[in-house]
């Protein structure tokens, strides 16, 4: 079911690059895996006992899946290419739930550069934040009968699928009438917006759709009419409605980029204050304007680091999730960012201060997404989880996989800033050389541990060797000596401090 990775593509990715074939392979595989996770959710719900998922909820899941299939069929039938993709449905997904006769089509997606948008149903299921929702469902269903709070969380998770199906059906132009459930006083319709209900709890909300207009009815409140827009967002004159927002497409021909500050699954379920990573933000108009100002120059800044940086961002990035600015960073002095393995295509970031900084953030984070997607297809190493490796960018020891991830992203950053330094003028050039020298020195300090590992597989050896060759080729255009000296001194100091901390953490003799 899963494709093999040709040596040429493995080499491209090891160089932190990747053409349309390489990126298309990763994207299609991640979409395939998303369908399999959804299948696992539906199977787990069917297998769950009545105290975990009762007959009514199972029936509703079947109805929601059928609505998604109807939405997909309605739009795929109007597009011969989409219809062809339908013929390549995943084996075993044809009957994802008993009683549902049609499968959602497989994970077909046009290669980067081919303007073939997903159907509304596929767009919702392959949306990055559907991944965390599915994982949350699986955790709840696999846990069995839990506490009242856990049971309520699972009910909310399963109810969210109804909203996903309704959005897909509305986007496909299908008329319908359905009952949804608001969560803690908020009904979120992914990609459209959110309704703040009159009641503050989990309340039923009746939603009908006809001719591009949703009518939302709730107890003790006037009806709300919401008008769908093409793409992301929907508008209404009701003060209770908050529309979803999007930024312009990264490329002129690209669809708008969702800036999602509404989805209930946009931040991890565990503590969001991991180091300098903050929690999800809800933006006001001023913050959205700052996002737009940074975003408008991001494509140019990406291209200055190589055309492939813009290509990979256009191919891999599906939504942006705003984060709060950590207090230790401060406005205008940087940002925090992350990716989530279960949310392929999402980039979490605080408000970027400028286009160049945000372009660098994209380069850095998309390498994590690329490498995570690649390792779903190829086993690169068999090292254990023990944290014992020095990484110049971290104060703590790293496991081998963490060192590989960090070195890979830093290698891309070294390449990005070297290309910028060779293209830009002072003072941008001097800044780019300083950044390149720092990343290059950090990669040089980390590579020996990666290359020397006996835990590398055959493809892993090829991958790491190509990383090392890419690092060495950068010496053809070295940074000025003063930048190189400062970068090497920084790494030397970081290693000395790391060694000192490690020594103090070890038990003394006879203790």
Language-model features: locations:
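Type-3 copper protein
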Residues: 1-321, 438-511
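Extended, well-ordered protein cores
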Residues: 260-272, 314-326, 337, 341, ...
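Post-HEXXH active-site segment of zinc metalloproteases
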Residues: 342, 352-361, 369-401
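Alpha-helical phosphate/pyrophosphate-handling elements in metalloenzyme active cores
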Residues: 348-349
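Long amphipathic alpha-helical segments
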Residues: 367-379, 413-414, 418, 422
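A short, terminal or domain-edge coil/loop segment
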Residues: 371-382, 386, 429-441, 479-491
């Amino acid at each position: 079911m899963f494709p093999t990775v040709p040596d040429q593509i493995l080499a491209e990715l090891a160089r932190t690059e990747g053409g349309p074939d390489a990126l298309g392979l990763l994207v299609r595989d991640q979409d395939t895996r998303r369908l399999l996770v959804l299948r696992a959710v539906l199977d787990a719900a069917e297998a769950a006992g009545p105290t975990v998922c009762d007959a009514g909820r199972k029936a509703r899941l079947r109805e929601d899946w059928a609505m998604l299939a109807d939405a997909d069929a309605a739009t795929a039938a109007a597009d011969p290419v989409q219809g062809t993709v339908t013929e390549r449905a995943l084996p075993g997904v044809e009957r994802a739930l008993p009683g549902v006769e049609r499968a959602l089509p497989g994970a077909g997606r046009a290669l980067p550069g081919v303007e073939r948008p997903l159907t509304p149903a596929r767009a919702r299921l392959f949306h990055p934040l559907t991944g965390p929702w599915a994982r949350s469902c699986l955790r709840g269903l696999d846990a069995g009968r839990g506490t009242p709070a856990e049971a309520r969380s699972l009910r909310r998770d399963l109810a969210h699928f109804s909203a996903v199906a309704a959005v897909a059906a509305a986007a496909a132009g299908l008329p319908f009438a359905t009952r949804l459930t608001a969560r803690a006083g908020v009904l979120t319709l992914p990609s459209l917006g959110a309704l703040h209900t009159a009641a503050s709890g989990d309340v039923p909300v009746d939603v009908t759709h006809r001719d591009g207009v949703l009518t939302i009815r709730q107890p003790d409140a006037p009806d709300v009419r919401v008008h769908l827009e093409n793409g992301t967002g929907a508008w209404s004159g009701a003060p209770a409605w908050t529309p979803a927002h999007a930024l312009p497409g990264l490329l002129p021909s690209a669809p708008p980029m969702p800036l999602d500050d509404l989805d209930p699954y946009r931040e991890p379920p565990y503590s969001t204050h991991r180091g300098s990573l903050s929690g999800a933000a809800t933006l006001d108009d001023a913050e959205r304007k700052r996002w737009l100002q940074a975003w408008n120059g991001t494509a140019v800044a990406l291209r200055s680091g190589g055309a492939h940086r813009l290509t990979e961002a256009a191919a891999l990035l599906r939504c942006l999730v705003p984060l709060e600015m950590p207090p230790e960073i401060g406005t205008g002095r940087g940002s925090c960012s992350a990716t989530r393995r279960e949310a392929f295509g999402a980039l979490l970031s605080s408000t970027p201060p400028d286009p160049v900084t945000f372009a660098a953030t994209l380069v850095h984070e998309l390498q994590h997404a690329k490498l995570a997607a690649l390792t779903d297809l190829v086993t690169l190493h068999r090292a254990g989880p023990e944290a014992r490796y020095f990484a110049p960018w971290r104060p703590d020891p790293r496991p081998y996989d963490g060192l590989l991830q960090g070195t890979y992203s830093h290698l891309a950053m070294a390449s990005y800033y070297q290309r910028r330094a060779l293209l830009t003028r002072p003072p941008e050039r001097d800044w780019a050389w300083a950044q390149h020298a720092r990343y290059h020195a950090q990669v040089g300090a980390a590579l020996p541990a990666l290359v020397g590992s006996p835990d590398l597989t055959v493809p892993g050896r090829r991958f790491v060797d190509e990383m090392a060759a890419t690092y060495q080729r950068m010496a053809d255009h070295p940074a000025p000596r003063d930048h190189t000296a400062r970068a090497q001194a920084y790494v030397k100091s970081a290693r000395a401090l790391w060694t000192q901390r490690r020594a103090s953490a070890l038990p003394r003799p006879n203790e």
